[in-house]
Amino acid sequence: MSSSDDLDEDELLQMALKEQSQRDVTYQKPPSANSRKPVTNLVQQPRRQKRAAAPPSKGGAKASRKPSMDEDDESEVELLSISSGDEDEGNDRGRGGGGDGGGGRGRGGSGKERGRARKEDDRAWDGVEPDCWKRVNEAELARKVRDMRESRTAPSVTQNLDRKVSGADKKVVLTSLQSFPRGMECIDPLKLGIIDNKTLRLITESSESLSKAEKVDNALREKLVYTSDHFDPKLFISRIHQETSAADLESGALALKSDLKGRNLQRKQLVKDNFDCFVSCKTTIDDIESKLKRIEDDPDGSGTTHLFNCMKSVTSRANRAFEPLFERQAQAEKIRSVQGMLQRFRTLFNLPSIIRSSISKGEYDLAVREYKKAKSIALPSHVNLLKRVLEEVEKVMQEFKGTLYRSMEDPKIDFTSLENTVRLLLELEPESDPVWHYLNVQNHRIHGMLEKCTFDHEARMEILRNQVHERALSDAKWRQIQQNGVQLSDDTSSMEDNQVQVDQPLEESARREKDALRGRYIKILTAVIVYHLPTFWKTALSVFTGKFAKSSQVNDTSASKAEEKAEEARYSSHSLEEIAGMIRNTISVYEAKVQSTFHDFDESYILHPYMSDTIKEVSKACQAFEAKESAPHSAVMALRKVKVEITKIYIQRLCSWMRASTEEISKEETWIPVSILERNRSPYSISYLPLAFRSIIVSGMEQINMMILSLKGEAARSEDMFAHIEEILISVRLAFLNCFLDFAAHLEQIGADLSQRTTKRESWQNGYSNDHQEEQSINAPESVVDPHRQLLMILSNIGYCKDELASELYNKYKYTWLQSRRNDEDISDLQDLMMSFSGLGEKVLEHYTFAKANLIRTAATNYLLDSGIQWGAAPPVKGIRDAAVELLHTLVAVHAEVFAGAKPLLDKILGTLVEGLIDTFLSLLDENRSDDLSSIDANGFCQLMLELEYFETILKPYLTVDATESLKSLQGAVLEKAIESISETVENNPGGHQRKPTRGSEDAISDDKQSSVSPDDLLALAQQCTSGMLQLELEKTRLNSACFIETIPLDPVPPVAKAAYSRTSTDSPSRNYRESQPMGSPVQARPRRR
């Protein structure tokens, strides 16, 4: 067919399609077979139906040739798989005379010829030979054909087949040959059975099922048919005789060789028997060939030129006469061709509208089935219109695929719909894996949601900043209005351009709101991954465990194994590890956002629940991921790592906050003592500073302890967390100890600053300063303003931390970090704390005792030098002087001050001060040996010894061993100075000039005694004065000394008191000193200790 014919045919097809679109798209079957003239399928495959062994009757033959309704439907389906070629149909009609018994010739002629043929058939039949097909006895004809075939078959075939039927597993015998219409080609050339012409396999017991399922293409058939030029013996043996034994194959080969040999002999015998015929035929052929050569040599033979010209003239006239008829005939042939093509491919032309209708109705399976039917049609290569129809179908299906892909992007799609969508896409053979497309879409959607959370958070933070700025601007304007009255200056507009100072309360409120927004942001991020990632992972598990793979398998028996392998490879091109990588990437994005936001939390509000609530949210996410089939193990470990990291940051911030808060409260000492109930009946009169420090440590350590317990629970489930937790525990322990050391250092600094200020005040008298009124106006009314009492308060704070607070808090929180530490290390930490506070206490105590020692030195100086007495000409002893009582009052004031401020340190402080007092007496005696204390007479010696015995008796509870030794040295120095003074007086008055006594003889020492005095006499005289006056003086001053001697009774001089005093006198340092001194030896004073 030429190109112009193709164009005309396309135009006719377009016109037919236009008419077809106006009809009903649903095809209705005609009511009867005679109402239409279907196009006969001339290339139909043989029907697979069993025929009876007996010859069929005439009526049966006719009935078998009549098409049924089912066969008509099958023919219509088979019509869709053949091509349209007029030339092939013409050739088929030409060859149809043998197969259809003249039916093809009847269809090829015109109506008049068919009518004439029917009239001739109705004529009388002579009964000898049938002159038309209807008079042919088809049964007899079939019998004759069968006999001819059997007569042409080698006689040994039947015998060999009959001989091999003895076993139960042998091939089908030759007697079943009559059910095959083709004859010799169905017999195995090896004479081992019969070959099925459809499947080209040897007929066995299971050949019935194989013939229905297996189809052989033409290329394979050409190689298996042994009469073909492309016959392949190896393929023939491997396919047809794949289950034949070797022995049978050998016997078959022998039979084949013998048959070939027999046929060669028969052919030679045939030539020999008909040699005359062969010679005659050869002569005839040579004659014909010579005549043809003569005709070719002389084409203008006798009369041929004239005949040729006449025929040419007739042909030209006929062409001019019948040209319109020929054109119409050609057009009619084209119309019939187009009509046949439309009839054949009517389903194809209706496919676009059918598929669109099915898709619009939601009948997706029907649309896919119709599309697959269209794909299976074998179209002629020269018909462009059919290709355009298929392109339209492809366009519709591409739109349908896009719709299915978009449906998978719906976040609310349920699992059933997803599975159905994936199944449809797999049946449509998409370019990419739809399951992987869905997983990628979901992964990008989760990332998009995380980014949207970040965008919303930044927007909320910006709104908050604008609100704070507007509030600050409004406050600034209001302050300007209050300052300038109702008049508004031009500075209001410039105020908006410049940076507005934000008030501290407003700034703190804004920081709290920012932390709240950060906590909300992390909570939303966590909710996104908790809600979506487990579902995403479960979907991936269902995909890679085969749930979608099963739905993607199409039950098409005609699909080749190569296509199945290709589909399997395409489906398995991705692994579950790639999905786990997607989830890990999502967790990494989440981790970066959480850690960045967690670092932005304000440390000032660390005790607020923002940071701890964030850690709890991450812990909930870990628990959700640890559920069955909720997330891959790597994602769980990554999320646990996020939790450990932010917990570590939180704990580090808590530790730094405790140290920073300790430093901050140390700068704000209020010097207000707490009540005994607030300090839990502690003997230390502490300020609020240790309690504030305790509150800071408890608040921080409680949060840390809660976080550590959570981390230990994580470590129990994962060994990888032990190293991180061990590092955190070490940092917590060091931070706890450093907080105490920092607090001790701050207390030491406060004490040093306070001592430095006290040394600059020269106007202090008995521990009071003249400028206290200024400090009272600054501090609270109940606060301590005296520097010495403040030093005592620092000492109490140190003692409270050392004796109570450190051990209490350490024993309470040591189990937080005691995961792998030994008990001796635990004890060493606490001992180090005690030693630190002890050393600090010694330093502050030195500041206090130094300040008090200055006061005591002043009082001692007033007592010994400025009391208005001349020790070289002292009056007689009448009792304890007022100067001694004033000196004792200084110690009483210190006792009261220490008892109220640091009672546990009372013995230590007074022991130090008493020892310092005695050393002060020694230093004053040594310093003024040549001045005010250049001489001491007997009365002065007795007075000093009485008062020293008085001091010793009262201060005995606070006399240390060193103080006792110092007192002995002091008494010896006084005795030595008295003896020296008396000796010098005697030497200066050799004439025996005697001073008249001004008082009674009992009160004065005679000149004879003074001139011949000895150390024992002086000690005896002093002991006499002491025994007569000491107890009386103790009674007089018992109220003054009650704080030192609490055992002194109120009754006047009871026997018990006397006995106590006698014991005291006996054990006094003066008596010991006297007993230890040799008679007449000079007294050497012990050097000063300080």
UniProtKB/Swiss-Prot annotation:
Q: Does the keyword Signal apply?
A: no
Q: Mind listing the GO biological process terms from this record?
A: acceptance of pollen; exocytosis; Golgi to plasma membrane transport
Identify the InterPro entries for this entry: Cullin_repeat-like_dom_sf, EXOC2/Sec5, EXOC2/Sec5_N_dom
Region: Disordered; residue ranges are 1-126, 486-511, 984-1013, 1055-1090
GO cellular component terms attached to this protein's record: exocyst
Instruction: Indicate the transmembrane segments per the record.
Output: none
Please list the residues that carry the modification Phosphoserine.
S179
Disulfide-bonded cysteine pairs: these are: none
Which stretches does UniProt call biased (Acidic residues)? 1-12
Pfam families, A to Z: Sec5 (PF15469)
UniProt superkingdom: Eukaryota
* Role of this protein: Component of the exocyst complex involved in the docking of exocytic vesicles with fusion sites on the plasma membrane during regulated or polarized secretion. Involved in polarized cell growth and organ morphogenesis. During cytokinesis, involved in cell plate initiation, cell plate maturation and formation of new primary cell wall.
- Could you describe the subunit structure of this protein? The exocyst complex is composed of SEC3, SEC5, SEC6, SEC8, SEC10, EXO70A1 and EXO84B.
- State the family it belongs to: Belongs to the SEC5 family.
Q: PANTHER family under this entry?
A: EXOCYST COMPLEX COMPONENT 2, EXOCYST COMPLEX COMPONENT SEC5
Protein name in the entry = Exocyst complex component SEC5B
Q: What is the lineage of its organism?
A: Eukaryota, Viridiplantae, Streptophyta, Embryophyta, Tracheophyta
